[in-house]
């Protein structure tokens, strides 16, 4: 994989804030000092080379659909078998093998909570293993991005979504954005045709959903491992409910912490409510970020566990609507 300066500036500058106008790639080209056709050609190449996943959006969990982070305790000889069974469930969009007793972690998504519960029941039936389900309680930072130029950066703190902005037809639009825009000069025309909506309406709704923080990011969604971010550590922290908000707010501001949120505990099975993700280019870099986090006054002496990913089985956009139309 070889990327030049323009590739790096394209990927670094547009992982969020895609220009929401009829010719977004032309607007990107103007900022980059090149042409629209060149931007589109590069995005096609970067997608085909496995560096870019899509040009689209990431959606806030549990707004237009339902989701949970879940885990299984899988005996080592059955890892490949169980991972295949979990991956066969349509709503599973992320699946990783991690260090620890609960070792196969996955994100399950569905159009609603009832469908999500049914999905987890099917996984339990197929695998013969109990599912640990840890739904999101609150997000401190879910604006995942990967700086390619300059030092590590602190991610912006999350703000609550305005769910009143959601409209009945937005689910299909969000599902389409999770799959990605067509790499053509006027992608919102193509998207609108698929959804039987006008270009202007599509752009207006994307802008409204982004401003409402229902869409947490609109831009170039990269495949971080292909860009050298090979270390993926999930760090969990055990602390009382009353301390979670202050600790989570501080933790989310540490450069190198790429996601931070609180999840529901399960008595007797899981008592680690605060989660953060550290994506790094090396194990040593990840541990440096963790050291900075542990030095925070809110987290000093707080018990924690660091669970590195050892294999990635699946990573794709979320399932929001049963039919994107």
UniProtKB/Swiss-Prot annotation:
Q: Which UniProt keywords apply?
A: Lyase
Q: Supply the InterPro entries for this chain.
A: AsnC_trans_reg2, HTH-Siroheme_Decarb, NirdL-like_HTH, WH-like_DNA-bd_sf, WH_DNA-bd_sf
EC number(s): the record gives 4.1.1.111
Query: Does Lyase appear among the keywords?
Result: yes
Domain of life (superkingdom): Bacteria
One short Pfam family name for this protein?
NirdL-like_HTH
Q: In which pathway does it act?
A: Porphyrin-containing compound metabolism
Single Gene Ontology MF annotation: lyase activity
**Gene3D superfamilies per record:** 3.30.70.3460, Winged helix-like DNA-binding domain superfamily/Winged helix DNA-binding domain
Q: Which reaction does it catalyse?
A: siroheme + 2 H(+) = 12,18-didecarboxysiroheme + 2 CO2
Q: What quaternary arrangement does the UniProt entry report? A: Forms a complex composed of NirDL, NirG and NirH. All proteins are required for the total conversion of siroheme to didecarboxysiroheme.
Q: What does this protein do?
A: Involved in heme d1 biosynthesis. Catalyzes the decarboxylation of siroheme into didecarboxysiroheme.
Q: Please give the family membership noted in the entry.
A: Belongs to the Ahb/Nir family.
What protein am I looking at? Siroheme decarboxylase NirDL subunit
Q: Which gene encodes it?
A: nirDL
């Amino acid at each position: 994989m070889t990327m030049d300066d323009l590739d790096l500036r394209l990927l670094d500058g547009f992982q969020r804030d895609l220009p929401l106008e009829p010719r977004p790639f032309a607007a990107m080209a103007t900022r980059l000092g090149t042409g629209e056709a060149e931007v589109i050609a590069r995005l096609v190449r970067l997608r085909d080379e496995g560096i870019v996943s899509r040009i689209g959006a990431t959606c806030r969990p549990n707004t237009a659909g339902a989701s949970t982070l879940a885990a299984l305790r899988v005996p080592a000889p059955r890892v490949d078998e169980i991972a295949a069974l979990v991956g066969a469930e349509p709503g599973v969009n992320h699946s990783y093998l991690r260090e620890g007793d609960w070792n196969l972690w996955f994100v399950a998504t569905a159009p609603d909570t009832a469908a999500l519960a049914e999905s987890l029941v099917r996984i339990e039936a197929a695998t013969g293993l109990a599912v640990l389900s840890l739904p999101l309680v609150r997000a401190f930072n879910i604006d995942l991005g990967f700086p390619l130029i300059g030092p590590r950066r602190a991610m912006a703190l999350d703000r609550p979504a305005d769910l009143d902005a959601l409209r009945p037809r937005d689910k299909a639009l969000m599902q389409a954005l999770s799959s990605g825009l067509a790499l053509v000069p006027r992608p919102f025309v193509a998207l609108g045709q698929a959804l039987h909506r006008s270009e202007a309406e599509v752009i207006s709704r994307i802008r409204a959903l982004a401003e409402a923080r229902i869409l947490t990011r609109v831009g170039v969604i990269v495949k971080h491992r292909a860009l050298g971010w090979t270390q993926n550590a999930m760090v969990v922290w055990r602390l009382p409910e009353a301390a979670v908000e202050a600790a989570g707010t501080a933790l989310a501001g540490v450069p190198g912490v790429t996601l931070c949120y609180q999840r529901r505990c399960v008595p007797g099975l899981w008592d680690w409510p605060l989660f953060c993700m550290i994506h790094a280019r090396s194990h040593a870099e990840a541990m440096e970020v963790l050291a900075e986090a542990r030095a925070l006054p809110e987290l000093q002496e707080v018990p924690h566990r660091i669970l590195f990913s050892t294999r990635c089985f699946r990573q794709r956009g979320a399932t929001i609507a049963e039919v994107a139309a």
